[in-house]
Amino acid sequence: MSYTASPCQELVEPCAVHAEGMAQEESHRSQAPPTFYHGASQELDLSTKVYKRESGSPYSVLADSKMSKPHLHETEEQPYFREPRAVSDVHTVKEDRENSDDTEEEEEVSYKREQIIVEVNLNNQTLNVSKGEKGVSSQSKETPVLKTSSEEEEEETEEDATDNSSDYGENGRQKKKEKQVEKVRVTQRRTRRAASVAAATTSPTPRTTRGRRKSAELPKRKKRAAKEPKAPVQKAKCDEKETLTCEKCPRVFNTRWYLEKHMNVTHRRMQICDKCGKKFVLESELSLHQQTDCEKNIQCVSCNKSFKKLWSLHEHIKIVHGYAEKKFACEICEKKFYTMAHVRKHMVAHTKDMPFTCETCGKSFKRSMSLKVHSLQHSGEKPFRCENCDERFQYKYQLRSHMSIHIGHKQFMCQWCGKDFNMKQYFDEHMKTHTGEKPFICEICGKSFTSRPNMKRHRRTHTGEKPYPCDVCGQRFRFSNMLKAHKEKCFRVTSPVNVPPAVQIPLASAPAAPAPAVANTPTSPAPAVSMNPVGSALPSRPVPHPFSHLHIHTHPHHSHHLPIPPVPHLPPPPALFKSEPLNHRSQSEDTFLRHLAEKNSPAQAQHH
């Protein structure tokens, strides 16, 4: 019997071990929700479930066929419809579970290992699922109901971190296991708290407790919904970014980067006036602008001429006060100017169009300014006023020449010789005499000149043109100075001498002597003629002389013109005739007077 008992003993031991393992798996798979609150240290009664004895001998074993497929019978269980335990039973189970921490940790580890297969539901809720198809425990279904939104977000972030991790080595697995164990502990603690609260406040039916739990969840979900209006806040922030305004100018930018770029380029390099907002590159320009109070005209320091813009002052200083050069030339006549704007104005002179017409006289002009100056002749307006003496002038150059009276010298003065000029044109021509510059060349002989008028004057020597006629004799001259000299000579011969309107002509008697022969030359003076044969003088009577230039003299040695003082406050009258006919007419007048004297002499003799 001993020989037969030993092999039977060897057969029983592995079966018992296998039965214990099967029983543990069965306990894990077939754990109903109420058994979750029992102590994990309870021993399994395998005498009734695993095997049974047929006889009194301890080695007779009969294996139960139902142990092979325990999970097929567990599917019929419905954990949600079992009767709930009393409150006292829950407290006792809780105390038993606290006393058995070691066994609970082992079960949690094994239980969590089975959950690695499925962790997230379609609703993004964490589920504690076993290996079987319907092995979902009641705890796992109740736990997500009691979770808050913040805790769910934490778990989701942890799950995302675990899903995105690409380290599938041993270290990664260990970390996953540790995290899963922590999750299980957290969920168990939450279920304990929920069970204690539900047992104290709920009715015996589980459905009502569930309904209350769902009603308790609603404010939590509302809290989460309250967090959703983050989008309008972000939109408001975007709006704030879109309305970034510059502090120094009214420009608006979408991003801060563009605003900083605008500040660096515009405001940190440019100088801006605080009053009117004008920009200046240099601080000196800004200070000059502020001295004019942003509205007054900018004046030149040298000549007190006012300008509206600063660049106009710069151009004026270059051109007028003598450190600029004429670099821009006309393509047609090669005339040079200081600026290109002056060249454009000059190009109008080469066109034939004259669109500006005077309404009064019908004269046409090429420029509007020329028409405006011309219209002053008809209106008699004098728009240019002297600020010192309030005298007004019709043209601007007249005012400039007048200002030399107040200044003490003319506006443009040569620094080399001290000669001053009223016109800039004359000043420029004079300055070329010092520099030796002669840019104007005659096309015929190649001679050069300092100014264009001088070249035109020289060209008349080649063309024979004589544009200056004499008003008295009609003779024409090539130059104006020649006409001036001719007028002085011509008027010296024909210049009248003023006499009183009534001239007394005494006809005195002369001694009886043979009268000298009258010269036939027109310039010889006529001798005195005795009008009375008796020798008595005729009574004096006023005779209005029709010719103011004719005088009769009694003495033969007197010259033709007597030094008669002119009449004060009266201008000399113009000459009526030329010199030669006047002398011939003088002879005819002498004969006419003699004839009158002869007629009157017999009547006077009879009277006496």
From Swiss-Prot:
Annotated region (Disordered), positions in chain: 60-234, 540-589
In-chain residues carrying the UniProt-annotated modification Phosphoserine: 57, 100, 196, 203
Keyword set includes Transcription: yes
Compositional bias ranges of the Basic residues kind: 548-561
Gene Ontology biological process terms, A to Z: regulation of transcription by RNA polymerase II
Ranges annotated as biased composition (Basic and acidic residues): 71-97
Annotated GO MF terms: DNA-binding transcription factor activity; RNA polymerase II cis-regulatory region sequence-specific DNA binding; zinc ion binding
Keyword Transcription regulation: yes
GO CC terms: nucleus
Compositionally skewed regions (Low complexity) per UniProt: 194-208
Keyword annotations from UniProtKB, A to Z: DNA-binding, Metal-binding, Nucleus, Phosphoprotein, Repeat, Repressor, Transcription, Transcription regulation, Zinc, Zinc-finger
Ranges annotated as biased composition (Acidic residues): 98-108, 151-162
Region (Mediates interaction with CBFA2T3): 497-608
PROSITE patterns, per database record: ZINC_FINGER_C2H2_1, ZINC_FINGER_C2H2_2
Residue spans, zinc finger C2H2-type: 244-267, 271-293, 298-321, 328-350, 356-378, 384-406, 412-434, 440-462, 468-491
Main localization of the protein described in the UniProt heading: nucleus
Phosphothreonine found at: 103
Cited InterPro entries: Znf_C2H2_sf (IPR036236), Znf_C2H2_type (IPR013087)
Biased composition (Pro residues): 563-575
Top-level taxon in the UniProt lineage: Eukaryota
Cellular location(s): Nucleus
Function according to Swiss-Prot or TrEMBL: Functions as a transcriptional repressor.
Oligomer status and interactors: Interacts with CBFA2T3.
Stated family: Belongs to the krueppel C2H2-type zinc-finger protein family.
Name listed for the protein in its UniProt record: Zinc finger protein 652
